[in-house]
């Protein structure tokens, strides 16, 4: 197997890991009761959650969602975008944009 093919396979596997569900011990419990198991769950939750709920998980001291994305899902790029997402709608857009990009990487 060629070096390029091996790299392409690894990139696909890495992308699939970012989009996969996390283990039971790593799920994220939102203030409003929603349970997040994947980036897709995060996207759906952000589209439905109240701005007040988002504020419980994101402020100048707390960045719960970006920490979960970085440390559990493993997506450093998205985590950095979420750190700067001062509103729920911006966070929802960042997650949807990242998911669309990752989906295109899987043939």
Model-derived features with residue positions:
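Terminal, compositionally biased segments used for targeting/anchoring and flexible tails
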Residues: 2-107
């Amino acid at each position: 197997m060629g070096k390029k093919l091996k790299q392409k396979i690894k990139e696909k596997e890495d992308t699939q890991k970012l989009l996969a569900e996390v283990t039971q011990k790593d799920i994220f419990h939102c203030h409003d009761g929603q349970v997040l198991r994947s980036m897709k769950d995060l996207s759906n939750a952000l589209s439905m959650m109240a701005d007040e709920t988002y504020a419980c998980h994101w402020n100048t001291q707390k960045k719960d969602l970006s920490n979960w994305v970085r440390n559990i899902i493993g997506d450093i790029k998205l985590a950095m975008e979420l750190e700067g997402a001062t509103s729920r709608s911006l966070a929802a857009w960042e997650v949807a944009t990242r998911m669309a990009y990752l989906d295109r990487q899987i043939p």
